[in-house]
Amino acid sequence: LRHAGVLALSRIGEVAPIVALAKSENRSLRIAAVLVLRRLQSEQLALFLQDQDEYIVTEAARAINDDWSIEPALPALASLLKEEKYTSEPLLRRSINAALRVGGEKELDLLINFAKRESVSSNLRGEALAAIGTWASPSVLDRVDGRYRGEINRDAIVVKHKIEKFIPDFLKDKNPDILVAAAKAISSLKIEGYNAQLAQIMKNHASPDVRSAMLAALGDLNYTKIEEAMKIGMADIDRGVRTVAVGLVTQLDLSKEKLPAIVEPIFKSGSIVEQQKMLSVLGEMPLEKSKDVLISLIKQGNDKKLSNGVILDLTEAVEATKSEELISQLGTLKAHGDGLAAYTETLNGGDRRAGYQYFNTNSAGQCVRCHALGGAGGAVGPALDNIGNILSREQLLEALINPSARLSPGYGMVTVTLKDGQTVTGILEEETEDELILKTSDAEPMEIALSRIDKRQNMASGMPPMGTIMSKREIRDVIEFLANLKKN
């Protein structure tokens, strides 16, 4: 009913009577007014940012920031950062985003003061610091809803001048969220006066996320003692910190004689992620330094002495060198064709988070148009909430590369020719070791013993073979994501 009323009032298009509802004592009318003004894209929504009800203020913030945005009202939304009474995270994230988008000195001051306020939750203070760090060149995508906002370039000198004097206070903070955000801001703004403090925090802080952030910042800031910091990072107990340290190898002026001493321990006892990072680094290094190490790794790969989770990374690193000599040595490591054997290097070693991102957002794969997770998504194909308990990694790969090879019960048509000559077509409801159960035009499902079947034909799946759409790296990431979708 409310939707019908909102739609009708927005089509009538009279703004003044709707704005007048800002003074109404009826909460429902004020909420409806926000919804109508959102449809009308009216900057008068800024009036509702002064409402006494934080829910209504938050709805007004959503209306102003999200979708196409109401840009004239963004300064008013940003100004809410000075109000200490608000606690709603959706509201304050939009206020932070509005300040970043408006981009004036006033908004920058609001962000800095908000980040300093200890009464604010650490994740929101960290978000404010992150916005400050990207002030000179924000992402083209909205920090809240991901919509494309276009390229913005500002003078970094202004933000560096304003934030630099507060850096010592942020680095003294005990909260990991603040320290990580501060390190990233220092790095992106190229503030170089605090390298010694970053190094000290990197050595001593209990949080691996903080140690990783400090080490990464030191690498970006060309720290003079980066080799020492890298060695400390490589000896860290946390895999993530060690992986960051591996990425710093390219910043060292290493001779080819010293390189094996760094690489070999990683492939002897390091994690898959560390090995993948090392291979990425080797692919970027001058060939005269990395050649001998790559030759050794290729041999290990051909001798089955490397984890399958790094074979794709090895082939990519070798191809990045553009050395025909090395590429020719890959042999069977570089699989070709369109069968499953050509994709075996995608079975392990994927990035689960990247797979999640691909599944939910990639416009080429369009996974969520057909498959649901947690009740959200399409119903053309089966829900995948428990797919990791149902299919092996090999079966997941087959489902991506050759989706018609195996039908999911309830989602595919099968035609079988029986040994007595009868032909039956129906939807596959269940398949066991002994029989097929098909839903046909008959009232009851038909149970057909496999021993009676002379020929079976699965109808082509509506899902295209994803090997023609996805890169091998994307396939590997999606397999890692799907293999971990398991219900207890």
Language model features with spans:
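C-terminal capping alpha-helices of c-type cytochrome domains
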Residues: L314-T321, I401, Q422-V424, L428-D434, ...
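Short inter-helical turns and helix N-cap capping residues of alpha-solenoid HEAT/ARM repeat scaffolds
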Residues: E25-R27, Q52-Y55, E84-S88, S119-S121, ...
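The canonical Cys-X-X-Cys-His
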Residues: G355-Y358, N362-G374, L384, M463, ...
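Core register positions within helices of long alpha-helical scaffolds
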Residues: A4-R11, L35-R39, A63-D66, R94-R101, ...
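Amphipathic alpha-helical scaffolding segments comprising HEAT/armadillo-like alpha-solenoid repeats
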Residues: L1, R11-K23, L40-Q50, S69-E83, ...
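Structured surface patches comprising rigid loops and adjacent beta-strands/short helices at the edges
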Residues: A443-G462
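Residue-level detector of extended alpha-helical repeat arrays and alpha-solenoid scaffolds
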Residues: R2, R30, V57-T58, S88-L92, ...
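Electrostatic cytochrome c docking/interface patches
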Residues: K334-N362, S392-Q395, K419-G421
